[in-house]
Amino acid sequence: MTQITIYRNENREVERFTCTGHAGYSEYGTDIVCASISVLVINTINSIETFTSVAYTCEADEETGDIDFQFTDEISPDASLLIESMILGLKEIQNDYGKKFLILDFKEV
């Protein structure tokens, strides 16, 4: 199962998210749930880098697939929109395939 934890501040802005584990929906190379989650998360990070000037840190472990993304500067409206779009897509995956494969956890920091 993949677990994604979204950390929001008191203004409900996402400051950080972590992604760990593999969905386990199917065999390696054919797991459409894991691939969908990966595309959403990686595309969001790439889009923030390409289309905004917001500073962030991102640690990724290529072997495990774990990602730890954190804004280190004020969050722009564009970056916030990209993150919220990712969350929307992740919620749809969770609704379609269930919590057996994807757990979304929201925490206030």
What are these regions (language model features)?
Residues M1-I32, V41-I42, N46-V109:
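N-terminal intrinsically disordered, cationic/polar leader segments
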